[in-house]
Amino acid sequence: MACLLSAAQRASAGVLFVALWGTVLGDRLLVVPQDGSHWLSMQDIVEALGARGHEIVVLVPEVNLLLRESRFYTRRIYPVPFDQEEQSYRYRTFGEKHFTDRSWLSGPQTEYRNNMVVIDMYFINCQSLLRHGDTLDFLRAGKFDALFTDPALPCGVILAEYLGLPSVYLFRGFPCSLEHGFGGSPNPVSYIPRCYTKFSDQMSFPQRVVNFLVNLLEVPLFYCLYSKYEDLAVELLKREVDLPTLFQKDPVWLLRYDFVFEYPRPVMPNMVLIGGINCKKPDVLSQEFEAYVNASGEHGIVVFSLGSMVSEIPEKKAMEIADALGKIPQTVLWRYTGSRPSNLAKNTYLVKWLPQNVLLGHPKTRAFITHSGSHGIYEGICNGVPMVMLPLFGDQMDNAKRIETRGAGVTLNVLEMTSDDLANALKTVINDKSYKENIMRLSSLHKDRPVEPLDLAVFWVEFVMRHKGAAPRPAAHDLTWYQYHSLDVIGFLLAIVLTVAFVTFKCCAFAWGKCFGKKGRVKKAHKSKVH
């Protein structure tokens, strides 16, 4: 009865929430997306806004990966100086290089160079957009009410300044954790692990030392990645621009966070948490996949996907993986577009695409092998499926650490693991009941919320359009770094203390000299007369 009452209360809250913001329709929204998996969550929000009657324009490079047509929005296409073949080559190179061996010292440099293969292409997209006169003329005449963008690449941030539009940012996290610096959130290194460290929020002293040093590198890394965008901003705006200040122009941050998964940390009032927004209620399986699931018998299935960026795995590693999958009794559905491993077992089926969320929501799914991208991690949490994680790049190592810390999965190094390592990890998360219990607890906590993340995101985009911004802006943005840390106050008080101490010392020294120095001189003079 209590459960039914609780469910009814949540439903009532959701209905009331929707009713309160369901009357304002018909605003114009400009969307500057980032291609690839970043677009998937943004697309859900954009289509929900389009379904509510808003006029939405999405800026799309003529060569793209996932930015397809939709009845819910209009695409404005701008030219880019490369073709589909070059784009495919860049993405393929990006995926393949994550399987090359690297030393501990060369790892960060290799990771940086590999990421730049794709990041340079995104920069070319931005450069082409900001230099395309027809598109800029169209945007100036568009009379948009707000701009919605993914600030991982700051093209939309620059356009918002150029057009004078309030902004909404949909974001997972900069490679340098600077969303909190830009947003004004306290970000202490003592318990908030920095990106790429693979630390938890319970750090040892040596880990805190490393965390502190990594924190010092974040600003240089930001300028290393984004200095070219600052040059673009100067070119477009015809004035000197400090790129970080553009991120601080009163945006609403829609952060794909949920503290069920993330480590707890302070956030600002203009930061809205919508983690798990990509988790939809599972649809009905197609006949093809239903047949796979039904044929699995009592052992069930394992879902395996390394994301859209990995199209092929080196033959030796693919054969090791295939050998491992053949050692478990479950049926394995492996999303893989590369060459078929010669030793592929009878229990393993290769598919070019799979309905990941629907399969994870099936009661016969026993485990999820994932590269630990945030979309896959949240789908695993939503559906309560324990995970074997093979992180490859970016924030995936940190995501895997979070799940492992909560006892809901096992992490393997994809370059170093053996066939037995993978097989044993699968058997562990499937047969050890604690992994299922822990992920089910995370799932229960994650889904127990008064408002769905998609509804919350739509509300805040409409809020910005209605009020032309109005996000709470912390005064921290107006302070210098030494004011923010109260170093001027500390220096002033320290100066007072030192001055008082100095004056006190001088007074004491003077008094000592007057009281005892004179007696000493008199005694010395008396002795000299006697002699």
UniProtKB/Swiss-Prot annotation:
Q: Does the keyword Methyltransferase apply?
A: no
Q: List the disulfide bonds.
A: none
Q: What is its EC number?
A: 2.4.1.17
Task: Describe the reaction catalysed, as an equation.
Answer: glucuronate acceptor + UDP-alpha-D-glucuronate = acceptor beta-D-glucuronoside + UDP + H(+); (5Z,8Z,11Z,14Z)-eicosatetraenoate + UDP-alpha-D-glucuronate = O-[(5Z),(8Z),(11Z),(14Z)-eicosatetraenoyl]-beta-D-glucuronate + UDP; 15-hydroxy-(5Z,8Z,11Z,13E)-eicosatetraenoate + UDP-alpha-D-glucuronate = 15-O-(beta-D-glucuronosyl)-(5Z,8Z,11Z,14Z)-eicosatetraenoate + UDP + H(+); (E)-ferulate + UDP-alpha-D-glucuronate = (E)-4-O-(beta-D-glucuronosyl)-ferulate + UDP + H(+)
Cellular location(s): Microsome; Endoplasmic reticulum membrane
Molecular function as annotated in GO: glucuronosyltransferase activity
Q: Which Pfam families match?
A: UDPGT (PF00201)
User: Which ranges form a coiled coil?
Assistant: none
What turns on this gene? Answer: By dioxin.
The text of the family note is: Belongs to the UDP-glycosyltransferase family.
- Functional summary from the UniProt entry: UDP-glucuronosyltransferase (UGT) that catalyzes phase II biotransformation reactions in which lipophilic substrates are conjugated with glucuronic acid to facilitate their inactivation and excretion from the body. Essential for the elimination and detoxification of drugs, xenobiotics and endogenous compounds. Involved in the glucuronidation of arachidonic acid (AA) and AA-derived eicosanoids including 15-HETE and 20-HETE. Conjugates small planar phenolic molecules such as 4-nitrophenol, 1-naphthol, and 4-methylumbelliferone.
**Protein's name in the database:** UDP-glucuronosyltransferase 1A6
Identify the taxonomic lineage of the organism of origin: Eukaryota, Metazoa, Chordata, Craniata, Vertebrata
Q: Which gene encodes it?
A: UGT1
